[in-house]
Amino acid sequence: METPAGKADRPRDHDSEQSQDNVVSWEGEDDPTNPLNWSPLAKWVHVAIISIGTFTIAREKSPLASSIFAPGVVELAHEFHEENQLLTTIVVSIFVLGLAFGPLLAAPISEMYGRWICYTVFNILYTIFTVACGVSTNISMLIVFRFFAGVTGSAPLTIGGGTVADLFPMHQRGLALSFVTLGQAVAPAIGPVAGGFLTQNLGWRWVFWLLTIVNGTITICQILFTRETYAMTILNRRAKRLRKTTVHSSVTHRSVNFAIFFYSLVRPCKLLLLSPISLIVALCCAVIYGILYVLVTTFSPVFQDTYHFSIGISGLGYLGLGIGNLVGLWIFSMTSDRYMVAQANRFGSAKPEHRLPMMILSGPVIAAGLFWYGWSVQARIHWMMPIVGSGIVGLGNMFFFMPMVSYLVDSFPTYAASAIAANAVLRSIGGAVLPLAGQRMYDTLGFGWGNSILAFMALVFNPLLIAIYRYGEYIRTRWQVKL
């Protein structure tokens, strides 16, 4: 059941749910084994490793693993003698489709077996599939391995928010989530630049060798320097140890059988289908994510064909989006937790909806950036103008994404991973499908009206964001989902 917002910042959050299952609880609110009571250093080591993992792996708003490869698509098509532009677009977007399915596995596994084992298994598999991408001998083989790389690369982005909920009380989560998202924010700026120069000088396969080296290193650090953070898993392990060392038969642990695992697998789907809040947020996110991926998959052709950039230099066209992401992330990190504390002092307690005022601004900001970008390219104005426009889009992106993730984590703290996974399904499908029509739309309408349509799409969904802010608490309490 959805955890009441007012209780989300107490160290015994998960304790009450464990007691209901007759599982051992924390030894007082100051129990040092409770991740909420760990030292700041231990908490931030986990945050740092997750942030670097999201930088290399995948998901929100053109992370490194998907954006770094975009500049190399032209060379890949030439090597494989592939003239079908739709198929070469799929090579980039299929990774995002994998991210739609991966969270449906990562979230329940993390909530059944723990965060640590989920990070470890998925990171190792992602590294293997990335190597397979690098040795692909035809485009079909590459598409298949890119899909599975997306599936297995989803763990840090799916359960990163859940890890933050494990480690931090509500009024501290905004800053922690900002750091977890930092890798995703800078990846659009660094990924394509690195990918462009790697492709130009060493070939497109070296993009995957670089990802393999970086992610392999991060996986080793994750195995060595992180530990389990999920309260249910920690308490279940404690109960299991106590059963072996005591005669108290009442000490039980939650065993994992097929029925329980299946129930965990369907939890994200239940949230998506039965929670109106979860569904509305996911639909809005699918549109925003799709719009961003239309831009990401067309930046390289725009700057190579319209502004005659080389493959290496064309990666610089992504800098605006990355810088805009960073500015938006900085604004959120500086204001969100302070606003939550102020609202708690004013009303007596903080609500998840107090994360959302910034999200209401996202639609107009994204639309303004799309108008700027599209008509600058259409008029062939100096290349700096579309880069500035994409930076405004990046700013609006963070205005939407950060409050959205924080809202889901605060609304479903115990099952934050499932809440984010439910959102990821629609959002990643939007990011995979909408770009397939992007180039054809630009060919038919031009960049001016093509991006104007995307801007109007961003504006159409803004009233829904206002409705969530005003009526979200009522909807959450009226339609609670038994999890």
From Swiss-Prot:
Residues 7-17 have a biased composition (Basic and acidic residues). It comes from the Eukaryota. Disruption phenotype: Does not affect the biosynthesis of heptelidic acid. It is found in: Cell membrane. Keywords: Cell membrane, Membrane, Transmembrane, Transmembrane helix, Transport. The keyword Membrane applies. It is a multi-pass membrane protein. InterPro entries: MFS, MFS_dom, MFS_trans_sf. GO terms for molecular function: transmembrane transporter activity. Belongs to the major facilitator superfamily. MFS-type transporter; part of the gene cluster that mediates the biosynthesis of heptelidic acid (HA), a sesquiterpene lactone that acts as an inhibitor of glyceraldehyde-3-phosphatedehydrogenase (GAPDH) and a growth inhibitor of the salt-tolerant lactic acid bacteria in soy sauce brewing. Might be required for efficient secretion of heptelidic acid. This is MFS-type transporter hepF.
